[in-house]
């Protein structure tokens, strides 16, 4: 998934920083990713052998992490063997792909996504929304409806539900008619948005170690956690993730919310992050660090964030030994620079601030 702030390409730098301070703990200890997003960092440390705790406040993020972090064993899909006979002769590791192909072949139906996020469903509205093609919207509606029906009928487990929903979210994002975020859609369907939606199965990361996933406000959760390594990747600026990914949130929740404005925004008042507010961010960060129960704390932040270097250093060094690493990084651009919209710089500096607690 093309996600603002994703640390996928920065993983070598992040791991180098963490292992240089925490050593073998980063291969065998407990690791908490408190602002997990799509789970890229948590996935990496799960693969390294850590017991990972992942948390994200958005439901779509919770779903992704429930699968990538929370799922540790193969998914057998025993409850669907009568519904999909091919499962009876399919090896365990391949059963997820069989179920995904079944969903991919469902007849399209009209539903919430096709009626509210596609051009055909919004033709008579004040604004025609073009987040997805009509065909992909209807395919999404059919698949999402079937996944919920199986869960209600107890034909799939929660783990199987998260696998299928994660697969749908990842594949829908790959055919979205956006410039990476859902705060706006493009005026015409781009080539990738015209591709038919597929259900290419997402990877399953197996593990024998316990893994945990939460959906909480980070500052409310921190007092309940104890970990060797606490990794923090909060929002850097005023853009709320609840607004930037509202369409994925609606697909994940499948709750048919009231929508507002040109972009079809759902109400996200209860998901506003203090880390996106210049007025509240320092207080929230100080509270988080003060109550963190961890041997090592690592903070990813860049030079364009709302917190200043002084803010970060003053807060972190109260709890122990502070330091930081840095690396140049290509900044996120949702669209190309133009005469009307000029990008300040093509690169930012990414920092890893660290704290070894007393």
Q: Where are the predicted features?
A:
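S-adenosyl-L-methionine
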Residues: 1-34, 40-48, 62-64, 71, ...
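Conserved Class I SAM-dependent methyltransferase catalytic core
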Residues: 274-323, 327
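C-terminal catalytic and target-recognition region of SAM-dependent MTase-like enzymes
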Residues: 308-358
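Conserved SAM/SAH-binding loop
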Residues: 215-220
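Class I S-adenosyl-L-methionine-dependent methyltransferase module
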Residues: 51, 58, 62-205, 238, ...
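Conserved proline-anchored active-site loop of SAM-dependent methyltransferases
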Residues: 31-45, 54-61, 171, 224-244, ...
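A polyampholytic, Gly/Pro-enriched intrinsically disordered region
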Residues: 75-84, 233, 341-354
